[in-house]
Amino acid sequence: MRVARVVTPLVLVAHGSADPRSAANARAIGREVARLRPGLDVRVAFCEHNSPGLVDVLRDCPDRAVVAPLLLANAYHARVDIPSQIAGCGAADRVLQADVLGEDDRLVSVLRQRVTELRVSRRDNRIGVLVVAIGSSDPVANAHTAGVAPRLLAGTRWAAATTAFATHPEPSLAESVQRLRHMGARRVVIAPWFLAPGRIPDRVERFARDAGLAMAAPLGAHRLVAETVLARFDRAAGARIAA
């Protein structure tokens, strides 16, 4: 008799936003994850603002599940918000939380591609790249995020790269642009370390427009973003099996 293989659901949880483009991007990533892994039960949930909520999705999961945060930084939402929602619906004993996407090499590669989509050559040594992230109240999380900029230069001849945080007053975006110019950049472009469009990326885009700078697209529902989600899922699911 053939025994049916139990497939652990992957619950892809995004923070959620009042901007519908953010939720649309999360769902697009969910579809790409499902396309890359046929047969995997992929469900999309949100911490707030959008539906379905994480608690509702977990209550509908028949058994075990892996919650994969669609987050770049290991900060409040990953360490407090999501775990509390898992515990609050009584699912802590059957749900594993995967690691955040973080500063994965695949995502840095996508960011580099987004910059080149601005018709920026990897061999152009005049280029300075300002990586703009949301920022966190956690300095450790910000330090990890700041590591993206120097890694972005790998395989290029770009003059320099540095990081600024959209929610932090210092250094300001304008100050960071000047820093790149002092580092030898003659043309500065902005690389948004965001998964999706939204109100904060729009604010950065307004700055770029006013400053006469080109700004790349967010990471979006790129195949490598979905691959990173699956890598986090596989690691969490594998840890459960090993245990």
Pin down the residues of each PLM region:
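Active-site-proximal alpha-helix that buttresses catalytic centers in soluble enzyme cores
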Residues: 1-243
